[in-house]
Amino acid sequence: MSTVKQRTRTEGKPQYPLMQSIKDTLKLKTTKRTNSEKKVSTLNDKSGSPIKSNSERRNGITRKVNGSKRLSAQRVALFKYNNVQVFNYVRNGNNSRKSSMSSLNSSGTVVMCNEYDSEVTNLKPQMLIGKGVLELYQIKTPAALDRKEQTMNYISLGRGGQIVHPILPKLKITKLRNENFKYLITFSNPERYWQIEFLQINGQLHDELLKITDEFESIISSVCIFIDENITKLASLKSNKTPPNNVNTLDQIKEKVQTATENDDDEAEELDYLLEDPIEQEPTSSFEYDVPTDLTEVFQRTMGRINSNGSRRYSSVPQFSHRRSMIRRSMSLFPEHEGRFS
């Protein structure tokens, strides 16, 4: 009875032949192969090239995004100095806020020092925000041929870039007057001020630091608004001076030349009159007894000068007129001798 039950159990189970088991084994291998190919295909993009990891992308490896080919952003160092200190400045009151805001809104133009003085003098240091390394760098993002390359400039303070701020084209950096190594950065929205001071490194010469600040100024002036208060103050002083009127000056010169010519003509006419009216020399024996001795000497000395210099032109006509009038007034006192000195 037990043997019959055991036989029925074995007959109820499905029996797999040898060929069927071989087919199942082959199917299992093919499914594993197709799964591995699918995994490899997921690591490739549409063009068949493998997709790179994040580290490869950071190193500037090319890739395709939305069908457009582009390169990763690149960092270009512009300037670096290892010893600066930066203070944050705030306004010392609200009296000059309107005048200062007008100068801030006029970004893109050079602000003269007389407008900028109130902005500087009404600031006070609040706190030290950084000391150490100052760096200027540029981030370039290349694009496809049909797009323009994008660039952005930044200023970094401290080691490792503890404080980073973008440098926009309208940012204003001012070199303070009578200060070779101090600069004021004016931020807007919100309104803030940084004063950067370049400090000497041990053993560094003054001229060497000047060369470094000159390099800093040349780079800053190419990426934003740079103002040198020493130069703008000199320009404002020159502009305040009234320029000479060339037309009036020329007219004055012509008038002086014409007046001098007329005076020369008058001198010539009067000298000719003197030469045409010669004074006769007569014996002065009787005159010497009638006229006082001192007055006679004056007459003789005066007449001698006139006779000796009558042949040349005097540069001063009033001198002749004065002497003639003096002689005539003197001779009016002696009517009997007036004809001799007329």
Curated annotation (Swiss-Prot):
One of its GO terms (cellular component) is extrinsic component of intraperoxisomal membrane. One of its GO terms (biological process) is peroxisome inheritance. It holds the Pfam family Inp1. Residues 41-53 have a biased composition (Polar residues). Disulfide bonds: none annotated. It is a peripheral membrane protein. The keyword Membrane applies. The keyword Membrane applies. Belongs to the INP1 family. This is Inheritance of peroxisomes protein 1.
